[in-house]
């Protein structure tokens, strides 16, 4: 997947699931299942319910995403 094909949106983490998966509600009201990107996992950045995050979505599957940034 090419980098320019991703859709970046902001959302709020609703629920923490096993294996570093999260239910995220996007700004437009949609809910997606998101996993943590490698850099966040590498640096042990904790993501908790209520955190505001940036999610990358593939145009092919808009129900799954990757968390790329957690706002402070």
Swiss-Prot record:
Keywords: Cytoplasm, Initiation factor, Protein biosynthesis, RNA-binding, rRNA-binding. SMART domains: S1 (SM00316). Signal peptide: none annotated. The keyword rRNA-binding applies. Its main location: cytoplasm. Coiled coil: none annotated. GO terms for molecular function: ribosome binding; rRNA binding; translation initiation factor activity. Gene3D superfamilies: Nucleic acid-binding proteins (2.40.50.140). It comes from the Bacteria. Residues 1-72 form the S1-like domain. InterPro entries: NA-bd_OB-fold, RNA-binding_domain_S1_IF1, S1_domain, TIF_IF1. GO terms for cellular component: cytosol. HAMAP family: IF_1. Belongs to the IF-1 family. One of the essential components for the initiation of protein synthesis. Stabilizes the binding of IF-2 and IF-3 on the 30S subunit to which N-formylmethionyl-tRNA(fMet) subsequently binds. Helps modulate mRNA selection, yielding the 30S pre-initiation complex (PIC). Upon addition of the 50S ribosomal subunit IF-1, IF-2 and IF-3 are released leaving the mature 70S translation initiation complex. This is Translation initiation factor IF-1. It comes from Listeria monocytogenes serovar 1/2a (strain ATCC BAA-679 / EGD-e). The lineage of its organism: Bacteria, Bacillati, Bacillota, Bacilli, Bacillales.
């Amino acid at each position: 997947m090419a980098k320019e094909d991703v859709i970046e949106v902001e959302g709020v983490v609703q629920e923490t699931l096993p294996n570093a998966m999260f239910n995220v509600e996007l700004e437009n009201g949609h809910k997606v299942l998101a996993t943590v990107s490698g850099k966040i996992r590498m640096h042990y950045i904790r993501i908790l319910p209520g955190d505001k995050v940036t999610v990358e979505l593939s145009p092919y599957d808009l129900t799954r995403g990757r968390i790329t940034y957690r706002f402070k």
